[in-house]
């Protein structure tokens, strides 16, 4: 077997057809994973119309790689690349937070996501999301328990986070919160603000037991992407 495998691209405008096309990509082309935008043209992914797609991914054991493609008008963020620097990680954060509280991971306990850009702010918001679920008294909001069976942070066990948060400190904290087995090396290539030579990620990764980390990453990639 070679080093390259097929990743399907999901066009979410027609969710039912998208689920069919995902199965077809597996049957015809041997896809092992699929690229998932953070929204369907601005529409959240937590609605029941997307359950068929997630059910197919769950049934076939496919990893869904969520990478935002902004539906916002660039005129709102005209300078400094703010759309890429800030809005994309925020879109991922919002998308997955909604998926958690709307019960997507409860309905699909075998669903596995890989999040670009270190998962946006999800790692840093874990305690805040949990506190909303655990709140009592006047702060308690029934919505935070309506569709979930456990604290939001528990669903992070269905999520992989890449190392493209782009600082040793943030990568290190991601490993601390999510666990080394839920962190996957990424470069964000070919974007200019990525980490193609791992200069930002390696200082954090090197703090781990090197041989154990190499073995974990190796096994993760082979299992998730290459079916070995």
Each predicted region: which residue ranges?
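Active-site mouth loops of central-metabolism enzymes
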Residues: 4-16, 44
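Conserved adenosyl
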Residues: 11-14, 19-20, 24-29
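Conserved catalytic cysteine-centered active-site region
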Residues: 2-5, 32
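Short glycine-enriched loops at secondary-structure junctions
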Residues: 12, 68-72, 189-191
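Mid-to-C-terminal alpha-helical segments outside catalytic/metal-binding sites
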Residues: 1, 20-24, 111, 161, ...
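Catalytic pocket-lining loop regions of alpha/beta-barrel enzymes
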Residues: 26-184
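Short beta->alpha linker loops
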Residues: 10-13, 117, 165-166, 216
